[in-house]
Amino acid sequence: MNYSLTIKIILILLFIYLLIIFYVYTKQRSLLYVPQIDNYDDELLIIPAEKVFIENSLNIKLRSIFYKHPSNTKTTLLMFHGNAGPIENRFYKINKLSKYDQNILLISWRSYSGNDGEPTEDGLYDDARSAIKWLEEKNISKKDIIIYGESLGTAVTIEIAQNNNFKGLILEAPFTSMIDAAKFHYPYLPVSIMLKDKYLSDKKIKNVISPIFIMHAIGDDIVPFRMGEKIYELANSPKSSYFVDENEHLVTYDENLMNMMDEFYETIINYE
């Protein structure tokens, strides 16, 4: 192979690589936020929850589900879902978690579940803060709120919980940062300089002062288990974990998990 041909091949490969970088850079948010995917269990609600709409700072109405516990408790579970699918995909969790003496608010992000808007990191933070404001208008304060973050929702949870006295946090399949997650899925790309939405949970978790329960499947191939372990390691006490030998991204809601959840709820009651 002569020198000029070698140079041509190198230039062609470089051009293809740059095209890939350009494509991923311009499409990154459509790769990260996938509201159209419906890949989790659908289950009908077995509790008398109502559909509500929570208005964010852009006046976008976020379709949400609110369950008011008959005990009239102020304790409220606020749920932030992950990057894929509608809120209906999480009804099976609400059904299980309604066993506790708490209200439940499950919100959907902008552009998800039929909502208007375009998702961004700052946008999701705004949606989350709007949900907290909605609860506060119902005389439910931060100290009454347990925040549940699922996958991408864990990063929103950690951001919102910083230096705030929430009743507790539940993190399902948390990741250290979107940079680390992107490196795992796209190891051949310079994601550190490409990413618009970085979600730096590993830098923020030290600022969380609420009790934390972290659950993660050891065989998770979307968010590697080591990331959940790292977040647990960095978290302040009191903290507890449920690391289970499963190969799914989200953990199975079985008796073992619910037993650990029972212990966490006992912890946050006693922590007061």
Labelled PLM ranges:
Residues 252-267:
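Post-His helix in hydrolase/transferase enzymes
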Residues 154-210:
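Hydrolase active-site cap/lid region
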Residues 57-134, 150, 154-155, 161:
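Membrane-embedded segments
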Residues 9-55:
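An N-terminal hydrophobic leader/cap segment in hydrolases
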Residues 229-250:
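Catalytic histidine neighborhood in serine/cysteine hydrolases
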Residues 207-209, 214-220:
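Short beta-strand/loop motif that positions the catalytic acidic residue
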Residues 93, 201, 210, 224-233:
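Short alpha-helix in the alpha/beta-hydrolase fold that links the catalytic acid
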Residues 139-151:
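Alpha/beta-hydrolase fold nucleophile elbow
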